[in-house]
Design a protein with these regions (language model features):
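Pre-Walker A adenine-sensing motif
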Residues: 36-50
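Conserved lysine of the Walker
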Residues: 66
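Hydrophobic positions on the alpha1 helix immediately C-terminal to the Walker A/P-loop
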Residues: 69, 73
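Short glycine-rich substrate-engagement loop in P-loop NTPases that contacts/grips substrate
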Residues: 88-120
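Structural recognition of the conserved hydrophobic beta-strand(s) that form the central parallel beta-sheet
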Residues: 149-155, 176
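Interdomain motor-coupling "hinge/lid" segment immediately C-terminal to the ATP-binding subdomain
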Residues: 161-285
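Accessory nucleic acid-recognition modules appended to NTPase machines
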Residues: 234-407
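Domain-level recognition of nuclease-like catalytic cores that cleave nucleotide substrates
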Residues: 447-484
Length: 484
């Protein structure tokens, strides 16, 4: 996010001459949208405003690119783009809270930004709405007026908006934003459509990938393990190729997350910070399951559950829950007190490990627990692609790294970072257990594409093609009430 002086308004106008005049927390006329990063989010935003009349709310963790995406779209597609940031401009909170009507609200807004609003040609962006949740109660009335389009964004929304007195259902569409996924990353570093399409074809039809392309993709995968998907870290890498600069950006983001913990939950901040700081070491343990007693020997899960929920709702951690059995639906088999806790970005995870791990990853050194890092990346990809996160562990059958639901089926995913990727006793046992519902098995590894004994062995980088498909079939059902 681009941060300027407190109280600085953000307005974009396109004049008749075609020249842009920009005041976006930078110098007048400065074009800040020259990034090489193109995101799937850009298309989601464009499709929303082309197809729907609702306001758009972007939620997600800090520094994942929410505000930037809205500013970019607003600058490029609207005659007038107006932004109010409730953290940088706290005086706006009381100003809008005292509004008596939609007309009064819009008059206050126009006066505040010192700019007339152009009907039908203006996008109004309210940023950092977590500190002014009452703004959401206005959304219904603003959208109903139909004069302008609206966008909202904020962090920690899962925490701050729980007590909103009136969520505008039917007037607000929410999109959760995540760090760049692996496909977005490789496109940013220069991999073209032809290569992506060839890889997708290999994924869908189980073709072996050309050896040269396969090796290059593994190198890019290793690079992604340390750069991650935070837009600022990716842009820093693209600009400099300097890993030390990338690490500095990542460290700043981690510090910001810890500051948020201290600011937004004063009572439990020490517990939450301890949980957050323990994520790397817990993932490095043999079973990767989070052990609560490492936070406090005397605390019970029932007392600390909200601390874990805080991290999940803030978007900075990805809980992956154990299930009693790999059976449909997974949600009903979920064990909420048994879980793994992954970082929201694999680059941040690598940054939290020992100094120098980045070069060890790039050099392929074997004294690193790649399993934890690989699994974190897979969790991150699955979450960004629409899947809920589950795994299975039992004394009888062993452990399945991930379970997902796809088109009414359960798929099991094993993540293997070493050469012994064919050793997966747990997967084999669960596949042929009649009590379980595992219909497809995928082993993500460093080898090329091949299928053996009904198990798909796929290169780890092909996780980028595993996207959730929500199949909507027509369901017509009518109850015969004659005779009642």
């Amino acid at each position: 996010d681009f941060i300027g002086k407190s109280g600085q308004n953000s307005v974009f106008l396109r004049g008749k001459s075609g020249q842009n005049k920009v005041f976006l927390h930078g110098k007048s006329g400065q074009n800040i949208f020259n990034s090489m990063i193109n995101r799937k989010l850009d298309n989601i935003i464009a499709n929303h405003y082309a197809q729907q009349s609702t306001a758009l709310l972007l939620s997600g963790a800090r520094q994942v690119g929410k505000s930037y995406a809205i500013r970019k779209y607003g600058q490029q597609n609207y005659t007038c783009f107006v932004e109010v940031n409730f953290i940088q401009q706290p005086e706006a909170i009381q100003l809008f809270r005292n509004a008596k009507s939609v007309a009064d609200f819009l008059l206050r807004l126009s006066t505040f930004v010192q700019q007339p609003l152009v009907k039908g040609e203006t996008l109004i962006f309210f940023d950092e709405v977590q500190v002014c949740p009452d703004i959401l109660t206005w959304v219904k009335f603003l959208v109903e007026s139909g004069e302008y389009r609206y966008a909202l964004s904020g962090s920690l929304l899962g925490l701050q908006l729980k007590d909103i007195r009136s969520i505008p259902v039917g007037y607000l569409s929410e999109v959760e934003v995540f760090p760049l996924d692996f496909e977005e990353f490789v496109r940013a570093v220069g991999v073209g459509d032809a290569t992506i399409d060839a890889l997708r074809n290999a994924w869908e039809n189980h073709y072996e990938v050309d050896a040269m392309i396969h090796n290059k993709m593994l190198q890019l995968f290793d690079l992604y393990l340390i750069v991650g998907g935070m837009p600022a870290a990716v842009q820093t890498y693209l600009d400099s190729n300097d890993m030390q600069q990338v690490i500095q950006v990542q460290q700043d983001i981690i510090r910001m997350y810890r500051m948020d913990i201290a600011q937004y939950d004063v009572a439990h901040k020490l517990y939450i910070q301890n949980i957050f700081d323990l994520i790397p070491s817990e993932l490095n343990a043999q079973n990767k399951r989070f052990i609560l007693k490492k936070v406090d020997r005397n605390i019970k899960f029932s007392r600390s559950e909200n601390d874990f929920v805080w991290l999940a709702d803030a978007g900075v951690a990805l809980p992956t829950f154990n299930v009693e059995a790999p059976c449909m639906p997974l949600l009903l088999n979920k064990q909420r007190n048994l879980f793994k806790l992954f970082q929201n970005d694999v680059g941040l995870l690598a940054c939290q490990y020992a100094s120098g791990i980045q070069m060890k990853i790039l050099n392929g050194e074997t004294d690193i627990n790649f399993g934890a890092i690989y699994e974190n990346l897979v969790a991150q990809e699955l979450k960004a692609h629409g899947y809920d996160l589950y795994y299975y562990n039992s004394k009888k059958y062993g452990e399945l790294d991930f379970l997902i639901e796809e088109n009414g089926e359960i798929w099991a995913i094993e993540v293997k970072s070493g050469k012994s990727y064919r050793n997966h006793n747990s997967l084999s046992k669960c596949m042929f257990c009649d009590e379980f519902h595992v219909k497809r098995s995928i082993v993500l590894c460093n080898d090329n594409v091949h299928v053996e004994d009904d198990i798909m062995y796929m290169p780890i980088y092909m996780i980028m093609f595993l996207q959730r498909h929500r199949r909507m079939e027509q369901m017509i059902y009518k109850v015969d009430i004659r005779g009642l």
